[in-house]
């Protein structure tokens, strides 16, 4: 069993369902300290965070990832117990194999080989690991980045180990992500009997025209890197469940996935203008999950493309598709941020797995990035 596979298995065996870390970060620190890393706990609330750094000079290259995993779901449906890693027919099974304990293990073994080779990096090496990526993502990477900023520490290049690949390791690298803005619209009405609508005020009827306008609006045209901004209604709640009662209140939750062509403030203003135009009696509560970010070019992109080509034979596709990641908290500091990790076909599913050999491939790619960026 390779060192990367062995470490990934040891991490999977720790039942670190978000926001728990279950000793994963302690295990990582034990591997990093002998390499010369200063390992600092930046815990916040229930969340465990590890900031490990080797060197004091810039530029700073950082691997970023998480040790928490989503719940396994019905464990009886798993081929093997989700927290008992098993390699079967070349596949490593276990919750977190792809998302993202395999990547975290590859970070460490890439660093071990790189430093064992006698390399003297032109700058500092760092790891930022949290147990709050799969949860609210408030007390994890966001908190660590704020702490580093207060101390005057910055990250120049950041490689996030999210499972970016689709068919084979390294076929897709994420160079950015769309922003995510949530809204909860509450429309007030007057409850009443459906037979006497003149004595009531139906908030559903009030809201229909405004909602239709929001759904059909073209928010922007996108650009070379991002598709047009998307508006999706995710939940609609109204009424008591009875068929003869006009509801007194309507609640609609919705989400924008937005490009760099528009800001969260602009979207909020445009939505509120639509509601005002339709005279709705209500309010909106907004929640910004993250701004869009893009690293379209630069040293990190070039080094990653070259490392993937060296190890895999073909250059990666550069993409901004998919959901949000913790890269959204690091990019606003000015860092170049990319995401590169295992194949994502089974993430969050029963029987999550990766090809065992892929983790060694990933570790070699990570080592190649280090060599090209830091010498």
From Swiss-Prot:
UniProt-annotated binding residues for Zn(2+) 1: 66, 99, 162
One annotated GO molecular function: zinc ion binding
Cofactor requirement: Zn(2+); Co(2+)
Repressor keyword on record: no
A Pfam family matched in the record: Peptidase_M20
Co-factor remark: Binds 2 Zn(2+) or Co(2+) ions per subunit.
SUPFAM superfamilies listed in its UniProt record: Bacterial exopeptidase dimerisation domain, Zn-dependent exopeptidases
Residue ranges the record marks as coiled coil: none
Documented EC number(s): 3.5.1.18
GO biological process assignments: diaminopimelate biosynthetic process; L-arginine biosynthetic process; lysine biosynthetic process via diaminopimelate
Active site: 68, 133
Pathway the protein contributes to: Amino-acid biosynthesis; L-lysine biosynthesis via DAP pathway; LL-2,6-diaminopimelate from (S)-tetrahydrodipicolinate (succinylase route): step 3/3
Claim: Hydrolase is one of the keywords in the record: yes
Residues reported in the UniProt entry to bind Zn(2+) 2: 99, 134, 348
Catalytic activity: N-succinyl-(2S,6S)-2,6-diaminopimelate + H2O = (2S,6S)-2,6-diaminopimelate + succinate
Keywords: Amino-acid biosynthesis, Cobalt, Diaminopimelate biosynthesis, Hydrolase, Lysine biosynthesis, Metal-binding, Zinc
EC class: hydrolase
Listed InterPro entries: ArgE/DapE_CS, Bact_exopeptidase_dim_dom, DapE_proteobac, Peptidase_M20, Peptidase_M20_dimer, Peptidase_M20A
Family of the protein in this entry: Belongs to the peptidase M20A family. DapE subfamily.
HAMAP family: DapE (MF_01690)
Function: Catalyzes the hydrolysis of N-succinyl-L,L-diaminopimelic acid (SDAP), forming succinate and LL-2,6-diaminopimelate (DAP), an intermediate involved in the bacterial biosynthesis of lysine and meso-diaminopimelic acid, an essential component of bacterial cell walls.
Assembly and interaction partners: Homodimer.
Alphabetized NCBIfam families for the sequence: dapE_proteo, PRK13009.1
Identification of the protein by name: Succinyl-diaminopimelate desuccinylase
Annotated organism of origin: Alkalilimnicola ehrlichii (strain ATCC BAA-1101 / DSM 17681 / MLHE-1)
Gene: dapE
């Amino acid at each position: 069993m390779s060192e990367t596979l062995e470490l990934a298995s040891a991490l999977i065996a720790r039942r670190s369902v978000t926001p728990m870390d279950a000793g994963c970060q302690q295990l990582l620190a034990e591997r990093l300290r002998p390499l010369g890393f200063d390992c600092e706990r930046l815990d916040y609330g229930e969340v465990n965070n590890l900031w490990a750094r080797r060197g004091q000079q810039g530029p700073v290259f950082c691997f970023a990832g998480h040790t928490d995993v989503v719940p396994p779901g019905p464990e009886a449906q798993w081929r093997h117990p989700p927290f008992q890693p098993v390699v079967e027919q070349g596949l490593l099974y276990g919750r977190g194999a792809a998302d993202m304990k395999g990547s975290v293990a590859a970070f460490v073994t890439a660093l071990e080989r790189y430093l064992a080779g006698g390399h003297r990096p032109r700058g500092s090496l760092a790891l930022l690991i949290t147990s709050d990526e799969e949860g609210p993502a408030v007390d994890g990477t966001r908190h660590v980045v704020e702490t580093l900023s207060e101390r005057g520490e910055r990250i120049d290049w950041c490689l996030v180990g999210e499972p970016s690949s689709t068919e084979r390791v390294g076929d897709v690298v994420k160079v950015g992500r769309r922003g995510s803005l949530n809204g909860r619209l509450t429309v007030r009405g007057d409850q009443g009997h459906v037979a006497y609508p003149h004595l009531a005020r139906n908030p559903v009827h009030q809201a229909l025209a405004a909602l239709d306008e929001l759904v059909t609006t073209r928010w922007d045209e996108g650009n070379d890197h991002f598709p047009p901004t998307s508006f999706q209604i995710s939940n609609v709640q109204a009424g008591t469940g009875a068929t003869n009662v006009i509801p007194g209140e309507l609640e609609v939750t919705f989400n924008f996935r937005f490009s760099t062509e528009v800001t969260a403030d602009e979207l909020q203003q445009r939505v509120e203008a639509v509601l005002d135009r339709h005279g709705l009696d209500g309010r909106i509560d907004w929640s910004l999950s993250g701004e869009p970010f893009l690293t379209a070019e630069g040293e990190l992109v070039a080094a990653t493309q070259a490392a993937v080509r060296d190890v895999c034979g073909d250059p990666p596709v550069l993409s901004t598709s998919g959901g949000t990641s913790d890269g959204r908290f690091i990019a606003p500091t000015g860092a170049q941020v990319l995401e590169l990790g295992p194949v994502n076909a089974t993430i969050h599913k029963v029987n999550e797995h990766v090809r065992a050999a892929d983790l060694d491939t990933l570790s070699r790619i990570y080592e190649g990035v280090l060599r090209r960026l830091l010498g």
